């Protein structure tokens, strides 16, 4: 039985890690032990931030809608309540886009939401 040396597999593993660490600063790009840690941490950040990205965009849409709605004399929560009562089925992403780019259309939606709100006694 001949002896098996694992040089080729080790080199392939190292090459894969160093390719992923391309563009990193200092020894992170060319020292395997440090590059492995950096690539691992980068993967953890990427996984976490794919979740955070969804929250961040939702918060951005809410801020944009809130700013546009306050110019019309409503708060965000009042507007969303009016939208629900009026039966308007647009999500926050679309409404934020309308508020930014199609002011007239958004003003019409705000008017519908205002009309659907119950009058204060």
UniProtKB/Swiss-Prot annotation:
Biological processes annotated in GO: ribosomal large subunit assembly; translation
Molecular function via GO: rRNA binding; structural constituent of ribosome
A Gene Ontology cellular-component term: ribosome
Key words, A-Z: Ribonucleoprotein, Ribosomal protein, RNA-binding, rRNA-binding
Listed InterPro entries: Ribosomal_bL20 (IPR005813), RIBOSOMAL_L20_CS (IPR049946), Ribosomal_protein_bL20_C (IPR035566)
SUPFAM superfamilies: Ribosomal protein L20
PROSITE patterns: RIBOSOMAL_L20
Superkingdom field: Bacteria
PANTHER family the record matches: 39S RIBOSOMAL PROTEIN L20
Job of this protein: Binds directly to 23S ribosomal RNA and is necessary for the in vitro assembly process of the 50S ribosomal subunit. It is not involved in the protein synthesizing functions of that subunit.
Sequence similarity: Belongs to the bacterial ribosomal protein bL20 family.
HAMAP family linked: Ribosomal_bL20 (MF_00382)
Protein name: Large ribosomal subunit protein bL20
UniProt organism field: Sphingopyxis alaskensis (strain DSM 13593 / LMG 18877 / RB2256) (Sphingomonas alaskensis)
Lineage: Bacteria, Pseudomonadati, Pseudomonadota, Alphaproteobacteria, Sphingomonadales
């Amino acid at each position: 039985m001949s002896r098996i040396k694992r040089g080729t597999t080790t080199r392939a593993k190292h090459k894969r890690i160093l390719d992923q660490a391309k563009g990193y600063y200092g020894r992170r790009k060319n020292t395997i032990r440090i590059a492995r840690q950096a690539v691992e941490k980068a993967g953890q950040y990427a996984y976490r931030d794919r979740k955070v990205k969804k929250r961040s965009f939702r918060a951005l849409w809410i801020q944009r809608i809130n700013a546009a709605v306050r110019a019309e004399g409503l708060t965000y929560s009042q507007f969303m309540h009016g939208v629900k009562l009026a039966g308007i089925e647009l999500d926050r992403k679309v409404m934020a886009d309308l508020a930014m780019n199609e002011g007239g259309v958004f003003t019409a939606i705000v008017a519908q939401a205002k009309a659907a709100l119950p009058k204060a006694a």
